[in-house]
């Protein structure tokens, strides 16, 4: 286990170095200072744990966080996973007091500080392209306003972007879009309870509940709603006791589903 965290810390330091030089890393520095990161960088979590001769019980515990990244540990990049687990364990749980809404407000505040504009309740209905090079030229809003830009970040499905928001899309892009399959997607239920966490026996901030510690098998079981009993359960009060009135607590339950089985759910 110590070797895992030593390697995970080297991964973190290598990532910090790469970030400090905007990704223009010196290969001699990478090999000389972060050789273990270079050697493990192309391997999955389970491949590296096997090389470390990790005991099964320790492996099961370390692999518990896989659902945060949505891929099982036979496929999941060790570098990404080790970086996350290392930070989670060494730095502990951090949560904005106003939760995710506070993060959104911070984004808005910083964008405006830098001279940007934030438009609320405004839909971008079309993405314009430059006929000379096919690149992005702007967007049209739902009120007809046209904004010139060479860069667009669209937080929606590629099928919507290329199928409805753009006029000219290359055949290569269409084929690539149609070839994509759904990855893991989340479903979350929030509960406000009229009992404190202590009275309900909830002692920790985060719980992982799995059918099996074989992550590849669990991933496959999560392709159907009926076979999916996985949940990551969080009690917000254990990170921030004042997040709900005294004598109450807040819980949320999250699961992932790995196919489009939810499309088979009827209104009934």
Question: Can you describe what each PLM-predicted range is?
Answer:
Residues 76-88, 246-248, 253-256:
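Residues forming anionic-ligand binding surfaces in small-molecule and nucleic-acid pockets
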Residues 82-142, 150:
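Helical element adjacent to the flavin cofactor pocket in flavoenzyme catalytic cores
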Residues 125-244:
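Mid-domain catalytic core of redox enzymes
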Residues 232-268:
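FAD-dependent oxidoreductase catalytic-site/capping-region signature
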Residues 1-8, 38-45, 58-59, 96-100, ...:
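Generic structural signal for well-ordered, non-membrane alpha-helical segments
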Residues 60-61, 120, 154:
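General beta-strand structural signal in soluble alpha/beta enzymes
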Residues 1-76:
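Rossmann-like flavin
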């Amino acid at each position: 286990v110590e070797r895992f965290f030593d390697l995970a810390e080297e991964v973190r330091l290598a990532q910090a170095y790469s970030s400090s030089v905007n990704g223009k890393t010196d290969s001699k520095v990478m090999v000389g200072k972060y050789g273990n990161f270079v050697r493990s960088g192309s391997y999955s979590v389970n491949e590296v744990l096997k090389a470390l001769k990790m005991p099964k019980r320790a492996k099961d515990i370390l692999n518990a966080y896989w659902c945060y990244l949505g891929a099982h540990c036979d496929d999941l990049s060790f570098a990404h996973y080790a970086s996350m687990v290392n930070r989670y364990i060494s730095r502990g749980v951090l949560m904005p007091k106003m939760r995710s809404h506070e993060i959104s407000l911070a984004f808005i505040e910083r964008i405006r500080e830098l001279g940007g504009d934030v438009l609320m309740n405004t839909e971008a209905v079309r993405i314009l392209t430059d006929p000379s090079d096919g690149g992005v030229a702007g967007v049209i809003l739902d009120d007809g306003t046209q904004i010139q830009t060479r860069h667009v970040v669209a937080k929606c499905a590629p099928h919507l972007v290329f199928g409805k928001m753009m006029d000219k899309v290359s055949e290569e892009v269409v084929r690539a879009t149609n070839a994509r399959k759904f990855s893991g997607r989340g479903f979350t239920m929030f509960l406000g309870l009229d009992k404190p966490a202590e009275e309900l026996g909830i002692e920790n901030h985060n719980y992982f509940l799995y059918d099996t510690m074989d992550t590849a098998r669990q991933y496959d079981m999560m392709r159907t709603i009926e076979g999916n009993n996985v949940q990551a359960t969080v009690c917000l009060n254990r990170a921030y006791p004042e997040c709900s009135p005294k004598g109450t607590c807040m819980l949320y339950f999250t699961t992932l589903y790995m196919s489009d089985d939810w499309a088979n759910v009827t209104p009934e």
